[in-house]
Amino acid sequence: MSKYMGGKEASSVLGVHQRTLYQWDKKGWIKTIRTKGGKRLYDVGSYLADKDEESKEDHKLSICYVRVSSNNQKDDLERQIKFMKKKYPNHTIIKDISSGINMNRKGLNKIIDLAIEGRVKEVVVAYKDRLARFGFSLIERLIEKYSDGKIVVVRKKENQEPQEELMEDMMDVMNVFIARRNGLKKYSNK
């Protein structure tokens, strides 16, 4: 939206002095055109649209997501939080204590809701599996599509072959089912 105005009107709309508009023009912060008589006309519409877009970007969240599988790993959770706060001091920390296979986690659901609302700038995780054992690419796609955001993985596993990755995923699934079976056994014996 281009709406050019003279200096007096533009300064009134933007709430700045005409001299400030002149400085902004010199710095290239606001578009201007010159009339044949040499008078400056300021593109206030584009300037306001750009500022509005910048303010929308300022309302997006940068998030560090940390997760452990059980309450027995709270020390590891605290280490993850400490590491993330040190490396990303301006990010919001969201944490979960739940299995990586469980997609119904309070913290993960909060991230997905924020992404759908368009409020996620980036999500930082230590490893991909901290966010999700399965469905990582789906969560990544949601964040990219709805928030124009990204996921940053701090520690990537080096050059892992697809077969190794598949084997690791299968072991994770088996561990979950074994733990669940053992948990059920424990309660059936009581």
UniProtKB/Swiss-Prot annotation:
Positions annotated as active site in the UniProt record: S69 (o-(5'-phospho-dna)-serine intermediate)
Biological role: Resolvase catalyzes the resolution (a site-specific recombination) of the cointegrated replicon to yield the final transposition products.
The family this protein is said to belong to: Belongs to the site-specific recombinase resolvase family.
DNA-binding recorded as keyword: yes
Protein name (database record): Putative resolvase R771
GO molecular function: DNA binding; DNA strand exchange activity
DNA-binding region: 11-30
Source lineage: Viruses, Varidnaviria, Bamfordvirae, Nucleocytoviricota, Megaviricetes
Coiled coil, from the record: 66-92
Keyword annotations: Coiled coil, DNA integration, DNA recombination, DNA-binding
GO terms for biological process, alphabetical: DNA integration; regulation of DNA-templated transcription
Organism: Acanthamoeba polyphaga mimivirus
Signal sequence, start to end: none
A Pfam cross-reference name: MerR
